[in-house]
Amino acid sequence: MTRSLLVPALLFTLAAAAPPALAGEADPAIKAQLDSLDIKYEVDSDGDFKITFDLGGGRSQLVWIRSSTEAYGDLKVREIWSPGYKHDGKQVPVEVANRLLESSHSLILGGWTKQKEFCMLAVKIPVNATPKQLRDAAEAAADAADEMEQELTPGKDDL
């Protein structure tokens, strides 16, 4: 195996074998994957990885890669979140909620969910996703959430 193939293969093996992160603890497998991709991040108080993607044209988008994972039977997934709309914290306006439902139908990855005062695009990927798959899912979340932010709050780039 050539050296260029050995490093990604080793990272994938380590990521697949790593134990799940405890609440508030950053997942070392995600750290290794992001570091291998030269993606800059911060670890928040929950142990999640916060990334700001530069989307060009003066726009940026926040994305969180969750360290905690969920399981259903033998399927283990992690979530990637990106906010697309901020509301008053009580209820999402009906028109916005309906638009997000319509959007969820046409998305290739993810769907919209309410997290406190934010409408978040939540993408679920296998825990053993490769670094490239992790990056692709995070970029897809950022792109879709930013498009929704532009549609629902024209002229703003707060998220």
What function would you assign to each model-found segment?
Residues 1-8:
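Bacterial N-terminal signal peptides that target proteins for export
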Residues 13, 18-19:
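N-terminal signal peptide c-region/cleavage motif recognized by signal peptidases
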Residues 22-73:
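N-terminal secretory signal peptides
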Residues 24-28, 90-91, 128-135:
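Soluble non-cytosolic domains of exported or imported proteins
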